[in-house]
A protein has these predicted regions:
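A short, glycine/Asx- and small/polar-enriched loop/turn
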Residues: 32-35, 82-84
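A common structural junction motif
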Residues: 18, 56-61
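Flexible interhelical turns and helix-capping residues at alpha-helix boundaries
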Residues: 41-44, 63
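Long, contiguous binding/interaction regions
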Residues: 1-24, 28-29, 43-53, 69-73, ...
Length: 123
């Protein structure tokens, strides 16, 4: 699976658990470490855990993909899933605001999802 498809799939899986304000940043021209960041907000520790579990378990079950590394505490405020070409950041809103990844990587184009939950519900 190419890195853009993986980023979109990670976004979709996070959306399945109602992650908020999900953004995909295309950092291919800005970083030699990864191609895409997926940034999502969870509203509580259990919500963060549910999002992280959905992404890791579904990628493992459906695509035999496991993160190279998992950083942060599942019961904490920020968890990072490193899939090499895609890095998924799941964080509480206050932590996301404090560190401002989108501002830090403001030169990175945003990738539009195939379908958002709101548009899918409207159909």
């Amino acid at each position: 699976m190419d890195s853009k498809k993986l980023a979109l799939l990670c976004r979709e899986l996070a959306d399945n658990k109602k992650a908020e304000d999900i953004v995909i940043l295309d950092v291919r021209k800005l970083s030699s470490v990864t191609d895409y960041f997926v940034v999502a907000t969870g509203t509580s520790e259990p919500h963060l855990r549910a999002i992280v579990t959905e992404v890791t378990e579904q990628l493992k079950a459906d695509h035999h993909l496991r993160p190279n590394a998992v950083e942060g505490d599942m019961g904490g405020a920020w968890v990072v899933l490193d899939f090499f070409d895609v890095i998924v950041h799941v964080m509480r809103g206050d932590v996301r605001e404090k560190y401002g990844l989108e501002e830090l990587w403001s030169d990175a184009p945003r990738v539009k999802p195939r379908r958002a939950r709101a548009s899918a519900a409207a159909e």
